């Protein structure tokens, strides 16, 4: 066992364990079956009304022997429900695939004698697993080492903090789980430890008693709610108009004698026809596709955003990112490369080199793998790399100096302390490293304050992170006791460089051009933070002053009323603590800002929760990730800028779908209403209307959701969070295009009535095709809404859009040419097809011309 604790499993043992005990995956809870989801579609009130109409039509078909229209209605209903079911099922599967990313979280294990990181799914029974503050326990296991280890078991027992130890004398006999046992899904709230995996996957306690959590939020997004209300409002209008049309057509039939023929079969057929027309109009008028467009757009966007290193954990974050006005960002790893390197170590006390190496090695929780890659905190890793370069084996130093107690680093205390039994001195030592001003306050006076401060300012002016190291002899068992009256020796200061990411200055410029304020909230010193801000283009010595920066201490000392006057101008908060970040978020929100916040530590969870969008780091703790809405897999600020672009583009695409659908709703309701009032019956059959409805709801939603993000949206200011989705420009477009559609369609009907009397089958077929192709070309107008280029721009990036259009066009031609009595159509000549397509295309051509003229006369901010 002792050898195993040091060496871990071999590669062969890992494979054998996986064969015997399986993967570390919890089987997802069994969701609704595909059949149940399909059946759910028939609970829609609109579908139920259609089914009633279909049954009545079937009854009449048995009487007169004409089944074609009934078959067409039933097929159309099934097609409509199948298409909706398919897209809902596809979206659900996409969300499930995103959930699997949770099992790719890296876990530190020892294999073949080397510390390495593997995905959580690859942890096996027998693995030697290392866990530390903020991490989630990946499997059930037994502790073999514990240093000040505290576990949050609230997911299993409700206990937020349970002490864990390997010392049997300290075991809690009343604990729910043994004091040396760790359970999958619990989190480390303090300390660190090593355990041997005893159960993985479904055999863990979590696998038996809990259900797998889902990334997809059950709470509807604000935009979904807005569109649902809009859909219901328009639906009520459509139902009211349908009732009015039913009454008007009923009165017309009664006055025309169609209901008083004495033939009950004929009378029933006429009543059924009137009823079917009214029902069909309700189907067309109710824009039930609006809420579905949100789900579809979010599903597609979440998958695409994953490719740009944005893992969306909560659906609302996609749309909210588009409204963000302030980004509060960390410095390390987000703005910088997080590739720490010790540039220089300044010694302030003469001690043995091995003792300094021992102090650095044991007072750390980081590791180096076989390739010298850092596992754990990058700053601590840089110190270990420096030890290796100087010829010291940090692992051997740790092994030879047993740990008595440890106080882990937190952003509140800004230091880490460890009590060891030193082999170098043969005595018990308390070792401390952390922020120089904090560590120096623990040390004995040495008359070097001015020298130390001068050197620190030089390092900070070069944007370097600084860590101080100190130690003292002690007899205490606990760090808290040893630090009550510390008289430590101030040994050295390490200057650690972390270059700015090359892509960050451009990303910051993009966000600032998009009207988004950037605020650096960091635990580093003011000088270091200011230099980083200068390098990324956020800080300008000519225009910025002390009003644009403050420390966490200054921030905490001010009242909310005082801060409300300064928070919007603030660019840098240095030496900040997590509660400072949370308070800053709340103050900014009180000023009406939409705030996105980055965080990677357990203590960042409150700020991530309170922010409108919480952005956790891929390298951050599990607690931070669980509290966030989006995880930046590459930790980069550039990914934040990409998320903003995605959010704005998503909102714009949904607006385009709303524009498209409401234009058709407007035209359809007016045409049928006016037609019925003036005695012109509805020239579209129920089956035709259902086909049109499929185009309006499903195909259009897919087409608009598939449009690629437009970088030009980053040249515009943020939209108000509570902005109504139908803007004045959209309302004007809906009214203008809808009026043109009404004029064209009613003009055709009245012209034919005046010249030929009754409408022929050929005329009805042409009318049906014109109606569909007006929608076809109007999709181009919707695509061009608020665009900076012609609708034909970026054909390659809009492949799905054009494929959907092709599907609609081919479907319409096939229906007309081969639909026959079922769709009440007759084949058209190629000349007629050219006329239909050519004349209706004018709506797209003229729309593009008008938009082009407007762009020249009054360029939009995003297109300049």
Language-model region placement:
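Alpha-helical transmembrane segments of multi-pass integral membrane proteins
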Residues: 707, 732-748, 773
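Long hydrophobic segments that form regular secondary structure
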Residues: 750-759
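Transmembrane alpha-helix entry/boundary detector in multi-pass membrane proteins
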Residues: 760-764
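Generic alpha-helical transmembrane segments
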Residues: 696, 741-742, 765-780
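The cytoplasmic-loop to transmembrane-helix boundary for the fourth helix
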Residues: 718-734
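Conserved cytosolic headpiece of P-type ATPases
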Residues: 1-717, 725-726, 739, 753-754, ...
């Amino acid at each position: 066992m002792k050898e195993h604790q040091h060496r871990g499993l071999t590669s062969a043992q890992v494979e054998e364990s996986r064969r015997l005990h399986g993967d570390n995956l919890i089987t997802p809870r069994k969701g609704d079956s595909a059949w149940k989801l399909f059946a759910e579609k028939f609970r829609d009130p609109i579908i139920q009304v259609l089914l009633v109409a279909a049954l009545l039509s079937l009854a009449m078909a048995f009487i007169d022997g004409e089944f074609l229209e009934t078959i067409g209605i039933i097929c159309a209903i099934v097609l409509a429900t199948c298409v909706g079911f398919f897209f809902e099922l596809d979206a659900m599967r996409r969300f499930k695939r995103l959930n699997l990313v949770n099992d790719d979280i890296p876990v530190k294990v020892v294999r073949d004698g080397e510390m390495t990181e593997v995905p959580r799914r690859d942890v096996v029974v027998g693995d030697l697993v290392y866990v530390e503050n903020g991490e989630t326990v990946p499997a059930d296991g037994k502790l073999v080492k514990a240093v000040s280890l505290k576990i949050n078991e609230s997911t299993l027992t409700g206990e937020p903090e349970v002490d864990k130890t390997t010392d049997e004398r300290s075991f809690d006999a009343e604990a729910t789980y043994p004091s040396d046992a760790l359970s999958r899904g619990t989190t480390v709230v303090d300390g660190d430890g090593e355990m041997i995996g005893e159960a993985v996957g479904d055999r863990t306690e979590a696998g038996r008693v809990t259900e797998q959590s889902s990334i997809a939020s059950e709470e509807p997004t604000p935009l979904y709610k807005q569109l649902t209300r809009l859909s219901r409002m328009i639906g009520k209008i459509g139902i009211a108009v349908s009732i009015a049309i039913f009454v008007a057509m009923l009165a017309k039939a009664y006055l025309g004698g169609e209901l008083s023929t004495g033939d009950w079969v004929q009378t029933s057929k006429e009543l059924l026809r009137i009823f079917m027309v009214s029902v069909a109009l309700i189907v067309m008028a109710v824009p039930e596709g609006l809420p579905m467009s949100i789900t579809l757009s979010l599903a597609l966007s979440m998958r695409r955003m994953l490719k740009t290193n944005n893992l969306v954990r909560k659906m609302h974050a996609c749309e909210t990112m588009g409204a963000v006005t302030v980004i509060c960002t960390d410095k390390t790893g987000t703005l910088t490369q997080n590739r720490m390197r010790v540039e220089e170590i300044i010694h302030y006390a003469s001690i043995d080199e091995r003792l300094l190496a021992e102090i650095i090695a044991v007072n750390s929780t980081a590791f180096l793998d076989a390739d010298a890659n850092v596992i754990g905190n990058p700053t601590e890793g840089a110190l270990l790399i420096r030890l290796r370069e100087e010829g010291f084996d940090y692992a051997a130093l740790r092994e030879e100096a047993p740990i008595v107690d440890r106080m882990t680093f937190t952003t509140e205390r800004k230091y880490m302390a460890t009590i060891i039994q030193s082999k170098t001195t043969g005595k018990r030592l308390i070792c401390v490293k952390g922020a120089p001003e904090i560590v120096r306050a623990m040390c004995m006076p040495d008359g070097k304050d001015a020298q130390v401060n001068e050197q620190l300012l030089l390092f900070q002016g070069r944007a370097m992170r600084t860590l101080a190291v100190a130690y003292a002899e002690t007899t205490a068992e606990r760090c808290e006791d040893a630090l009550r009256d510390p008289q430590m020796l101030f040994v050295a200061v390490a200057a650690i460089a972390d270059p700015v990411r090359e892509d960050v200055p451009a990303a910051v410029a993009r966000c600032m051009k998009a009207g988004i304020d950037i605020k650096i909230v960091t635990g580093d010193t003011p000088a270091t933070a200011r230099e980083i801000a200068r390098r990324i283009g956020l800080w300008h010595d000519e225009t910025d002053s002390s009003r644009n920066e403050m420390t966490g201490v200054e921030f905490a000392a001010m009242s909310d009323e005082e801060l409300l006057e300064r928070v919007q101008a603030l660019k840098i908060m240095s030496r900040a603590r997590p509660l400072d970040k949370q308070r800053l978020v709340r103050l900014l929100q009180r000023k009406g800002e939409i705030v996105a916040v980055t965080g990677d530590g357990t203590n960042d969870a409150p700020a991530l929760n309170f922010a409108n969008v919480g952005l956790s780091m891929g390298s951050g703790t599990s607690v931070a990730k669980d509290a966030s809405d989006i995880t930046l897999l590459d930790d980069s600020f550039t990914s934040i800028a990409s998320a903003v672009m995605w959010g704005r583009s998503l909102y714009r695409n949904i607006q385009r779908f709303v524009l498209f659908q409401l234009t058709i709703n407007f035209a359809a309701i007016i045409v049928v209403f006016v037609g019925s009032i003036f005695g012109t019956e509805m020239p579209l059959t129920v089956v035709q209307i259902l086909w049109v409805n499929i185009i309006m709801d499903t195909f259009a939603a897919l087409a608009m959701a598939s449009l690629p993000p437009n970088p030009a949206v980053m040249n515009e200011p943020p939209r108000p969070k509570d902005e109504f989705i139908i803007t004045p420009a959209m309302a004007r477009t809906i009214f203008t295009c809808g009026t043109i559609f009404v004029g064209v369609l009613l003009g055709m009907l009245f012209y034919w009535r005046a010249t030929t009397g009754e409408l022929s089958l050929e005329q009805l077929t042409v009318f049906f095709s014109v109606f569909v192709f007006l929608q076809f070309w109007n999709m181009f107008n919707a695509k061009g809404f608020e665009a900076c280029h012609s609708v034909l721009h970026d054909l390659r990036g809009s492949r799905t859009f054009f494929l959907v259009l092709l599907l609609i066009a081919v479907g319409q031609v096939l229906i007309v040419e081969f639909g026959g009595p079922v769709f009440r159509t007759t084949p058209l000549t190629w000349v007629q097809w050219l006329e239909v397509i050519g004349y209706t295309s004018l709506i797209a051509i003229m729309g593009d011309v008008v938009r082009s003229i407007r762009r020249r006369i009054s360029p939009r901010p995003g297109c300049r």
